């Protein structure tokens, strides 16, 4: 289990407000896909998603939005820019409160008094936060894999964004109505390679690929992160962010979108996937 932090304080620097967390000696390295929130007695942690890459010779950064908590040597201090939400431990009151804009709070359905904590976590040191379930739960490591797929945390909600058609004839009815959901898996898997998508889709019959508008999703507050084996993951994809096309016909909608929206760009910062005027990735 993660050990308690020694200090947690806010400081002002050139980059604005930052949350500084100093961890105890013996803090275990945490790898893999892991969305986390610190739950520490009498401490508050203000955190912002950060995509700063690991620098050579530097200890790992806490990459919250990417869902990765890297190895942090004992005595090392990590600083994170503060975002519009704050995860606050309230062991005495037994709930976790969020500092979110009111419009996002309403869309997420978060109660004003905060999110109830699992009683087992009141004295715990770390937990995974699932906004969709309104509760915190402890993250147990898998044997030989470290802390991986311990939970999910959605800190955004679908708002006003570019709407892309998904209701073309032949699209599965369930996907048209509900979009892509993880069902029994932890997350929805995405692929940037049409060949890989075709192989996976052909396992259960004829392959039908869906282009995911990751640019619009990201602007709406959804998170994308990458697993150790290179698969892109997200919590869910609403139907309005999908475009259906057949792999067999090689009708890639990017050819149409390029004419209307200009040249392709590369989303190195957010997803590393080729982007076609706001649409990237194949799910």
Curated annotation (Swiss-Prot):
Disulfide bonds: none annotated. The keyword Transcription does not apply. InterPro entries: Ptrans_KptA/Tpt1 (IPR002745), RNA_2'-PTrans_C (IPR042081), RNA_2'-PTrans_KptA (IPR022928). Pfam families: PTS_2-RNA. Keywords: NAD, Transferase. PANTHER family: PUTATIVE PHOSPHOTRANSFERASE, TRNA 2'-PHOSPHOTRANSFERASE 1. This is Probable RNA 2'-phosphotransferase. It comes from Deinococcus radiodurans (strain ATCC 13939 / DSM 20539 / JCM 16871 / CCUG 27074 / LMG 4051 / NBRC 15346 / NCIMB 9279 / VKM B-1422 / R1).
């Amino acid at each position: 289990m993660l050990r308690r932090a020694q200090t947690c304080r806010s400081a002002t620097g050139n980059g604005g407000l930052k949350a500084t967390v100093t961890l105890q000696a013996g803090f275990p390295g945490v790898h893999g896909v892991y969305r986390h929130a610190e739950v520490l007695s009498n401490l508050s942690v203000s955190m912002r998603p950060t995509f700063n890459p690991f620098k050579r010779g530097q200890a790992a950064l806490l990459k919250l939005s990417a869902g990765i908590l890297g190895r942090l040597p004992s005595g090392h201090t990590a600083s994170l820019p503060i975002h519009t939400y704050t995860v606050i431990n309230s062991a005495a009151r037994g709930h976790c409160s969020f500092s979110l804009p009111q419009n996002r709070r309403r869309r997420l359905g978060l109660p004003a008094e905060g999110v109830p904590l699992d009683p087992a976590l009141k004295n715990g040191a770390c937990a995974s936060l699932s906004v969709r379930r309104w509760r915190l739960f402890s993250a147990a490591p898998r044997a030989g894999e470290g802390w991986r797929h311990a939970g999910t945390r959605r800190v955004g909600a679908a708002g006003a964004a570019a709407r892309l058609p998904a209701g073309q004839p032949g699209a599965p009815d369930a996907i048209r109505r509900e979009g892509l959901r993880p069902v029994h898996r932890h997350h929805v898997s995405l692929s940037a390679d049409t060949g890989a998508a075709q192989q996976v889709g052909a396992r259960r019959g004829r392959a039908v690929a869906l282009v995911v508008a990751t640019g619009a999703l990201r602007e709406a507050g959804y998170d994308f992160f990458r697993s150790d084996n290179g698969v892109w993951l997200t919590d869910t994809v609403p139907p309005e962010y999908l475009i259906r096309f057949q792999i067999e016909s090689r009708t890639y909608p990017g050819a149409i979108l390029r004419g209307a929206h200009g040249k392709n760009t590369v989303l190195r910062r957010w997803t590393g996937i080729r982007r076609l005027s706001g649409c990237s990735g194949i799910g």
